Amino acid sequence: MSSWFFPKARPRVVFFLISIVSEQLQTLNGRVTSEVRFRMIGILPLMFFLAQAVHYWRIREFGHVLWMCNIGNLLLAIGLFWCNRRLMRIAIIWTIPGLFVWFLYVVLAWGVFFTSTLAHVGGLIVGMFVLRQIGMARGTWLFAFGWYLIVQLLSRVFTAAELNVNLAHRIQPGWEQRFGSYWEFWLVLTVVIAITLWVVEILLRNIWPVRLAQAEVTLT
């Protein structure tokens, strides 16, 4: 979950690209359907994901892209491009716990870095905007939990053990004395994650229920 600190010129480049996307969305307003405009929002989380992916590729730790907070931006982008509400909601529900974990284990330990901030804060902002349009559906937490289990399994199979992506290989450092084995830690972690996703879904459903969603697009 570490991130690459861009030199001064590079944040400007990213902000410039984001401004271009925003200008294009405004230019297209009235010339394309609202559904197409809604799909194009997916360019933003895709950019957030690619910024992190380029960083990890450069430092030869590409496995870090499978952290839930990073891969979630890619899932949100795909959901928007395909106009798939379920994929959008799965990605969005993960932005809340992802933000807290990032703040506790990255910001407090290492400080604020540009691409990491884009992935977490930027992803959250886009996610909340999208959620206003589609609303949070009951039962989303179950799909989000299943998504977590799949990504954690992929992390265990395809990423290096020293990266410990999604805590798929060993106990989180500092917690070794509390658990007798990794699988005891994994079981507790899995239960905590399931409960957290359930609580986050309830919170988001109360704020943006589906029946009050402001979408003007027809989604599948």
Which ranges hold each PLM region?
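Cytoplasmic-side transmembrane-helix entry/capping segments in multi-pass membrane proteins
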Residues: 88-96, 116
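A contiguous pocket-lining binding segment that forms or flanks enzyme active sites
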Residues: 109-152
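Hydrophobic cores of alpha-helical transmembrane segments in multi-pass inner/ER membrane proteins
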Residues: 71-80, 121-132, 186-202
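Membrane-interface transmembrane-helix boundary segments in multi-pass integral membrane proteins
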Residues: 160-200
